[in-house]
Amino acid sequence: MTTVSTAAASGPAVPPPRIDPDVPAKVAARNLNFYYGQHHALKNINLSIAANRVTAFIGPSGCGKSTLLRIFNRMYDLYPGQRVEGRVLLDDTDILDPKLDLNLLRARVGMVFQKPTPFPMTIYENIAFGIRLYEKLPKSEMDSRVEKALRDGALWTEVKDKLNASGLSLSGGQQQRLCIARTVAVRPEVILFDEPCSALDPISTAKVEELIDELKTHYTIAIVTHNMQQAARVSDYTSFMYLGEMIEFGPTDKLFTSPSDRRTQDYITGRFG
């Protein structure tokens, strides 16, 4: 993996214009390009993700939306043969700086994946494990942090009497909420959701969507989803991506009711995708 910062060539990093000038940008991408080998997966992406809002990324499979999400916490570093150009700012921190401590970055930018991935340990330890990576707490404080995380994950009342049970013993929906609780336990600033409900039943999906709406009070959220109805329900802003390009980005209500680009209109009305 090679990271190329364009700061020297393009001057100071000036984030793209915000959709809502009254809402500060938490994450901003500027002239972002990403390559898998010779494949140009993301093409000149420019956007600002508003703080304490939910931004959804929609588009057909292979359009680059999950790739973009993984750039925000440098998950792509785990794979060889990839290259990124441009700037991505988390507040004033350049996420693409090769000298950046990735452990600290991933504490600031947490991620919840498509399939629930609880650790093969107790419910309590699923939460405490991540906290211990960054903080050394006495038992009483750790207990309080675990409880708060499980409450934030809307799971506490369901598991408070079985914290020593395996996280793998929970239902699929509970496991996903455990993963969300595990993510918020380390107190991130941004949470990335990559198709978090695709493996869940409608009832579990509704619980996760309700939780996302509650979490944006304290966190900036970006979500990738193939479910356009879900994007319309949970997000404040939506980006439509196609063939590695960001075709349209704006307030969710406007994008779904009066899109500016014909390709967006064709996608949301089911003409392709």
From Swiss-Prot:
PROSITE patterns linked to this entry: ABC_TRANSPORTER_1, ABC_TRANSPORTER_2, PSTB
Keyword ATP-binding carried by entry: yes
Residue stretches spanning the membrane: none
Membrane topology (UniProt): Peripheral membrane protein
One example of a Gene Ontology biological process annotation: phosphate ion transmembrane transport
Record Pfam families: ABC_tran
SMART domains registered for this protein in UniProt: AAA (SM00382)
Subcellular location: Cell inner membrane
EC number from the UniProt entry: 7.3.2.1
Molecular-function GO terms, alphabetical: ATP binding; ATP hydrolysis activity; ATPase-coupled phosphate ion transmembrane transporter activity
Domain of life: Bacteria
Domain spans labelled ABC transporter: 27-268
Main location: membrane
Key words of the record: ATP-binding, Cell inner membrane, Cell membrane, Membrane, Nucleotide-binding, Phosphate transport, Translocase, Transport
First-tier enzyme category under EC: translocase
Subunit (UniProt): The complex is composed of two ATP-binding proteins (PstB), two transmembrane proteins (PstC and PstA) and a solute-binding protein (PstS).
Function field: Part of the ABC transporter complex PstSACB involved in phosphate import. Responsible for energy coupling to the transport system.
Protein name: Phosphate import ATP-binding protein PstB
Organism the protein comes from: Nitrobacter winogradskyi (strain ATCC 25391 / DSM 10237 / CIP 104748 / NCIMB 11846 / Nb-255)
